[in-house]
């Protein structure tokens, strides 16, 4: 029997899955790590952390499965969006931490680009806009703020490309990662844009010349890495791609109209389309399957699950506050109490902008806020307001997407850590009006990487590929009685950012003085 391995390098952990040809999970392993945040608005990671985690997770899977290494036919790596990419020298040695997707330090570069470049031309070529989220702005920060590093840089590699080189010795980049850089990638030609590289002052030689679709083979596994991983030398290593698109693939999205919200540290709500229009404020790049003809377009909140984690860590229930039997998990107790709070949190709103915001706001200086606080509000109200606030951000992106794509299926699939919460799934149904489905297997992007590996290795029938491996289960239906209330609150949510924008900017500028 033949098997494959899917890996997902995430922001806070790496996961590996060893999967059989029918999608059965044979082994799984994960390894956690932290993001370095040396200054407000900065977020970076050294790539060795990712590579060590990949080795550890895959080796743990192969050791647990005890298979003949020759039975494992392919490996595919999905990864977080690596922003700037990893600046490496000719020997592929990292010169500086990778400025990841949530890093917002390139605001001066954004301001300069907006003043000096033809933005309509940039949007038409790349299908994307200008914001410090995009990798090309972070590249310019490295060029201008770390000139010694820039002079030594031979390539700028996304996380999966760096790992793939360590495994195969080959330098390549997948189209989804290249397109997500924005600014320098021609989304129609599916190639680097020489005119935009020249206009922005980024040397084309820094971009890997070998562009592959996610399901194409980068190379065979080298003997050294093979021994560390418990795999056979020569095992096919696929190009892989961006995690949000991989999670969408895992969820069985294979046609326009279907849509998925991946809610982990951040939130990415996405769908498939044939063309991109940056005017709607969404991010677009070639999909991880059929990327020569299909685009993955998404909108997302920077700090979705991160807002929930932040609240739990800073304001969660202490042991003495637990109102039930001893031994109840404080997080579960908080969830239970929040479920008893009326929809709308008694007039309390939360703006989930803990590190600025991505689409469709696109403002690195936006700040998180509780609005409407009163003496009647307790921790349970605030916690529910956080869940609702992230969900309003989801709806905000869905409405922007509707302007671009039109009709959407009445079912929304949710993947990621948020899917563990029954309360949150119900809030999503009530706020968006969609039937909410989740994946029974709870494996997301790594499962998508494994599915892609199995397809590339010829292990799937057409029906298996069309329908995917996942088993979807219904989680929540919208409550019609709450529709008007949530529509009113969402309208108030939409008004908050424009009303507070100037104050957000004043506070941010005062902080940075």
Give names to the regions the model predicted.
Residues 1-96, 124, 152, 226-227, ...:
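N-terminal glycine/serine-rich phosphate-binding loop of ATP-dependent small-molecule kinases
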Residues 5-6, 114-128, 137-172, 183-199, ...:
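Active-site core segments that coordinate phosphate-bearing ligands/cofactors
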Residues 23, 96-122, 277:
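Glycine/GP-enriched mid-protein hinge/lid loop-to-helix segment characteristic of carbohydrate kinases
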Residues 23, 46, 75, 103, ...:
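Residue-level signal for inorganic ion chemistry
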Residues 31, 99-106, 265-267, 440-444:
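Short, acidic/turn-prone active-site loops that include or flank metal/cofactor-
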Residues 63-101, 129-133, 164-186, 210-215:
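Short beta-strand-loop/turn "lid" adjacent to the catalytic site in phosphate-handling enzymes
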Residues 87, 108-112, 247-249:
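Pocket-flanking alpha-helical
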Residues 201-213:
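A conserved helix-loop-beta module that forms one wall/lid of the active-site cleft
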